[in-house]
Amino acid sequence: MDINMTLVGQLIAFVVFVIFCMKYVWPPIIGAIEDRQATIADGLAASDRAAKDLELAQEKATAQLKEAKVQAASIVDAAKKHEAKIVDEAAGKAQVEKERILASGHAEIETERNRAKEELRKEVAVLAIAGAEKILERSIDAAAHSDILDKLVAEL
């Protein structure tokens, strides 16, 4: 194989080309590749952080949901206690009102009974006088014998 000037020229051109590529072409390509690697690494790291953040957010949401359920249960319990208190108060008020109405009714009945007794006593006194008049066949003066009538009314 003959080594001639063409081969040497090609060798020199190739070396110059390689040096040129290493000096001017290769660094931007390597820089772009390294930038792309860094971007991908940052994206993967961000993805991992986002996954961890999502997991933390889900745990926090679960904890808040549990807390909300506990609060809701306590609110429901408080409402039930309040309801029971209101019902008890209403029942107490109704009982007091019932007792008042019953007492009023009993007092009214007692008053009416006493009035009826008085009317009956008066009627009995009148009937007794009428009966005595018929028996004695004479009229008894009611004013003169009021003591006798009062005793008779008291006995009835």
Curated annotation (Swiss-Prot):
Molecular function terms from GO: proton-transporting ATP synthase activity, rotational mechanism; proton-transporting ATPase activity, rotational mechanism
How this chain sits in the membrane, per its record, is: Single-pass membrane protein
Keywords tagged on the record: ATP synthesis, Cell inner membrane, Cell membrane, CF(0), Hydrogen ion transport, Ion transport, Membrane, Transmembrane, Transmembrane helix, Transport
Q: Where are the transmembrane segments?
A: 11-31
- The superkingdom of the source organism is Bacteria
Chief place where the protein resides: membrane
Indicate where this protein resides in the cell: Cell inner membrane
Record's Gene Ontology CC terms? Answer: plasma membrane; proton-transporting ATP synthase complex
Primary role:
F(1)F(0) ATP synthase produces ATP from ADP in the presence of a proton or sodium gradient. F-type ATPases consist of two structural domains, F(1) containing the extramembraneous catalytic core and F(0) containing the membrane proton channel, linked together by a central stalk and a peripheral stalk. During catalysis, ATP synthesis in the catalytic domain of F(1) is coupled via a rotary mechanism of the central stalk subunits to proton translocation.
| Family per record | Belongs to the ATPase B chain family.
PANTHER family on file: ATP SYNTHASE SUBUNIT B, ATP SYNTHASE SUBUNIT B', CHLOROPLASTIC
Which NCBIfam families would you find in this protein's record? ATP_synt_b, PRK05759.1-2, PRK05759.1-4
What is the protein's quaternary organization? F-type ATPases have 2 components, F(1) - the catalytic core - and F(0) - the membrane proton channel. F(1) has five subunits: alpha(3), beta(3), gamma(1), delta(1), epsilon(1). F(0) has three main subunits: a(1), b(2) and c(10-14). The alpha and beta chains form an alternating ring which encloses part of the gamma chain. F(1) is attached to F(0) by a central stalk formed by the gamma and epsilon chains, while a peripheral stalk is formed by the delta and b chains.
Name the chain's protein.
Answer: ATP synthase subunit b
- Lineage, broadest ranks: Bacteria, Pseudomonadati, Pseudomonadota, Gammaproteobacteria, Alteromonadales
What would be the name of the gene that encodes this protein?
atpF
